[in-house]
Amino acid sequence: MVQDLSTLTAFIDGEPMRFNDGDTVLKFIDRHRGRGHVPTLCDAPQLEPYGACRVCSVEVAMQEDGPRRVVASCHTPLTAGMHVFTESPKIRKLRRNIVELVLTDHPLDCLTCEVSGNCELQTVAAKVGIRQVRYPSGANHLNRSKDRSHPYMTSELSKCINCSRCVRACDEVQGQHVLSMHGRGFNARIIKGLDQSFMDSTCVSCGACSQACPTSAISDVFFSKSIEATRKTRTVCTYCGVGCNLNVATKGSEVLSIQAPTDSEVNHSHTCLKGRYAFKFVKHPDRLRKPLIRYNGHFTEATWEEAYDYIAKNLQRIKEEHGGNAVGGISSARCTNEENYLMQKFIRVGFGTNNIDACARVCHSPTAWGMQKAFGTGAATNSIEDLEYTNCILITGANPTEGHPVTGSKIKQRVMKGVPLIVIDPREIELVPYAKHHLQLRPGTNVALLDMFAYYILEAGLIDQDFIKKRCENWEEFEQGLRNLNLDESERTHGVPREKVRAAAIEYASAKGAMAFHGLGVTEHSHGSKTVMTIADIAMMTGNIGRPGVGVLPLRGQNNVQGAADMGCQPHQGAGYLQVNDEANHKLYEEFYGAHMSNEIGWKIPQMYDAALAGKLKALWIMGEDVVQTDPNTEHVKSALNALEFLVVQELFMTPTAEFADVVLPAASFLEKSGTFTNGERRVQRVNAVIPPIPGTKSDGQIVCDIMQRMGIPQADYTPDGVLAEIARIVPFFKGATWENLTDQGTQWPIKEGGIGTEILHVDSFKRGLGKFHFFRFQESKEIEKHHDEFPFILTTGRILEHYNCGTMTRRTGNAQIVTEDLLAIHPDDAAKKGIESGDMVRIFSNRGEVNMKAKISTEVKPGILYTTFHFPENLVNMVTSSECDEDTMCPEYKVVAVDVEKVPASSMPKKQRMMEIA
Amino acid sequence: MAIQYISGKEPHAREKRLIFKNIDRVGFTPSIDSFLEDGGYEQLKVALKMEKSAIINEVKASGLRGRGGAGFPTGVKWGFIPPTNTKPVYIICNADESEPGTFKDRYILHQDPHQLLEGMIIACFAVNAKLGYIYIREEFPQAAIIVEKAIAEARAKGFLGKDILGSGFDCELYVHRGAGAYICGEETGLIESLEGKRPYPRIKPPYFPAALGLYMSPTIVNNVESLCHVKHIIQMGGAEYAKLGTPNNTGTRILCVSGDVQKPGYYEVEVGKVTMGEVIDVLCGGMKPGRKLKAIIPGGSSSKVLRADEKFKLKDGREIGIMDIPMDFDTMAACGSMAGSGGVIIMDDSRSMTWVINNLNNFYAHESCGQCTPCREGSLWMKKISDRIVSGEASPDDVDSLESVANQIEGKTICAFGEACSWPTQSFIKKFRDEMKGDCKPELVGEIVSDEGKVAAAGLAA
């Protein structure tokens, strides 16, 4: 027996056990005796200790026979040599008495309760052995009414046991502070917002409260805590680059509900309303269930065989008539690594062309490019987990609480605990009230602002000389550039007082460790890549690379946008980021694939459109992307698609893009297939099929594999683990990845032999050897130069929490009941000048086109700036966006659009709209 | 010139007026002029020239124990601020005087606010707190107005603000008003409230706000009366002050006597220098005519009740009766109760103990914050059961079940409210069980589980 009391040993009912520094008594018991050995009502693994239910009480003593004290084990720190008595008669009586009191005010309709069999109160009551309730009935809360106002969240507070778990989940997990306790003592009760319904409150429906509630007092319409399901499958969310793990409950082929696994390193019991609740699109009647072939302008249902034959015939013909370069492919960041890998292989091997691209083009291509130039690797240098260790957070051009909700919550939690936050954004995003610094610049002036930011770091002498000298190159040029800055001109350009920039720069540079997050507000500009490189400069000049709590972290938009690029869905780099026009690489690829391949860089997506219009691109294959709705300058995209001879689209739904196709292939959604997604922190995670593909559909990987085989391109039958094994052989940083060793938590690449992952990149040296500084002088966007005089407003676009991109999926879920349309945010001063009021229909027009939508007067934007989202096809905002793009990567400049705005007279509104107004 | 008091409100000869010197004094107003005429803020001037540690040492030497209820040594509390602390330090004056039977702080706030301010500024200086809050309960609206005016006056005279009296010490005091909750008198609940949150008392650790309190910074929470004593300790010196009262029970304290005596009211006496018998018979003029003493709650409603005919065995072997108990901290504790907040409630033989405990249980059920299950549910059940006993509808077994509810609250909650609400019930039942059972219906013995309860327990009720 271990008796060394000088170390971390304590006793559970007389038995000596090791404990960890910082353990509470309950954590210690849980670890050695299993969760539930000591019952509790108010404690939950995802929440801070609370100590209110007292059911977890134990007796403690410093000697085995010494005087004992009753303490709540959940918040009592363990000390060496402590004796813990978990089930003395006194404790058992105490627990029984408490639960008995709770039951005096709890309905006993257990058999018909949705959580029957999974109710923590029920379990605890059973465990402590309640046989009777001795107290005569009296005042109680059994008649509280149910809240059924919300498409997802429900409450039935007669079942509430006042444990405050929901309030704490709202505060500590989500950080929304919607739920609170009202009244005191026996009259204490949970309220939402200002004692409103879920629907009327500011609830963001993340469901953290529902998952935390030990009873059915707060739940959801899917009864996610019921034990009705026959199977629970762990998989990864398809909605954004955070990569939340999901536990999906199913019965047969029906998806019942989704919860977030408590042990997930990525999302620790948390996820947002998209991951948790927006899954009903899966069996939506609109799902495509049969291949469609366009004959004479009309779609006709076909069998898979017919469709494959038709495709193979046409592609073969075009290849023969116009050469392989007349074919192109657009892969999808929504699909798995395996599917993306096969897609690029299909195009490259099948047609001997590098005309393969993916939707990263329109979001984070400047990140991949810029970070490769600076560091050698186009991916996040650190992990989200590093937020726990950082001393300062810088967010440039990102709105994480809407776009990356779980990461947004984590940032908010850290900031609420005192970590200073700097937000560089033209809008007052949700995090701004929490931020110490908000640099509200004019859209399109990132480089001007960040140059000034870097200048003030230099001026304050806060650079890391040692790091610069040992780890970087080209510093002198960068320093010279900064020293030559014209601060007056910069200040005029970006519009933020220089003192504010200076204060923020000093905050960032003087922190022991600072993390820089960025999003599409950085990349989707004509100087997107340059901005990324300037952020990299700032991180390097302050030594914020290569250790915990620092780094440059792009908030990747789509669930697998990292993976799509990793897998080679880029025209200039093949699988594993090997340059296709490099001789050695070209040879490597040709040998690996045993085929003749092109060593010329292919077309990027915008170039494909131009090539189509020029008659050079004849056939295009689009896997899971709605380019008509999401790519800029819609009319231009449409005419390009019209100019194609042959278009194949793999889709879940008949999207505006699929409408242009010659063949539409019905694909399976993420819940219906297996594979891997790589999240924004390079974490390769297993996606597990939750249900089989709905009848008539196939996974995207299966489809590509089928067509490859049909066209005689050598490819083994499709299995996700088989393709992963092939990937591991060609992609250097996947070398050690196997289906098995990715484990439930996933592994961050580079993955070494044995499946060992990498949390932090560039620890001792950069991937490219030395980190390279780049200095760029601000240049005005051509969009502003050309059109600002005629169209004096700057429109910038973004996303909201409730909808995902063009909303193909979320508009077919309950989310559509929460947010029903896109709105245009306009500053009150501008609105007054234009005679616009909130709710008015307005016309936004640029030299490309126009779009009508409702206005929302808001100070989230400065005068002269307009903001809207792009989720609804009814408000096709890309009608007005421009074809201007990042010089290096051709990522479109969605964030700076010269427009004008005017109120639409009621008579010129569409008829349906008028009817609604009148009603 | 001798101090003149309002006719009929003159201090009793047995009193020793330090803190209440100016209460009911003819011509004395809450204004700073009155206070200055009386030598006000002179001790602040003295203190500002002292070493900070010397002030703390004087307070330690004085033996001053907190007058809010717990009787914790004030100087020791001040010493808990971590020496390595780099965060701001706060002082909070707990003016949430809400313990039933206690009514001393309100007189200080209403009539002599500058005495509090002077003591508090000295305390701030001693612990290097540049910011202090006076948390005044909602039910004292006038007090808040008076104290705010006093703060403005003190500021105008340079006793607050930047560089007080050229000492280089900056200090600001603010009044914060409660919203009507007893729990805000609990120091961590008060801190939460001051932070703008629901006043749920905090879990331990941290064990003392002096380590982590307001805004997670070291915070000293002292009662109004305790802070007033600081001024007098500076004036007299700690050692001299300690000569007042009895060893370990030094200084003076204000007793708030209510109930069935001829002259209820406030009496400032040297701690331990008067007995309970003297309080009743000498200070308060005895019991009401023809009435006999039945019971005493000696230190605010949360302290355990004492029976008139009880005998108490002291550590030194003496056995004393209730009238012989000296009014101090230690003897009162040895007698199984506590000196608490100084609220002495005298009950004569006309009082029904069942009614009294029911009255208290109603109060505590109303004031439980609702955070901890045993207290939230238990305090209500204590009320429900004692309601039933009072109405004569109870079984004698109900008295035992009432006791068992109290037993499972005590020591099983985050804050001391658990004890505060269960001690009265436990002690009343222990000492007046027969009387309470006598108020019940004997024929109901064995029937305490009502029919509905039985059904509910079987899991059959809707």
Question: What spans do the regions from the language model cover?
Answer:
Chain A
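Long, low-complexity segments enriched in small/aliphatic residues
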Residues: 555, 562-570, 720-814
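N-terminal cofactor/phosphate-binding cores enriched in small/glycine residues
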Residues: 17-80
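Short beta-alpha connecting loops at secondary-structure transitions
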Residues: 11, 80-86, 195, 433-441, ...
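Catalytic alpha/large subunits of respiratory electron-transfer oxidoreductases
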Residues: 107, 163, 168, 224-673, ...
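Fe-S ferredoxin-like electron-transfer domains
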Residues: 54-206, 210-236, 251-254
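Short strand-turn-strand beta-turns centered on an Asx-Gly dipeptide
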Residues: 12-15, 251
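N-terminal leader/propeptide and maturation segments of large enzyme subunits in energy/redox metabolism
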Residues: 108-146, 297-298, 462-498, 575, ...
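Long, contiguous, secondary-structure-rich segments that constitute the structural scaffold
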Residues: 693-751, 813-824, 829-919
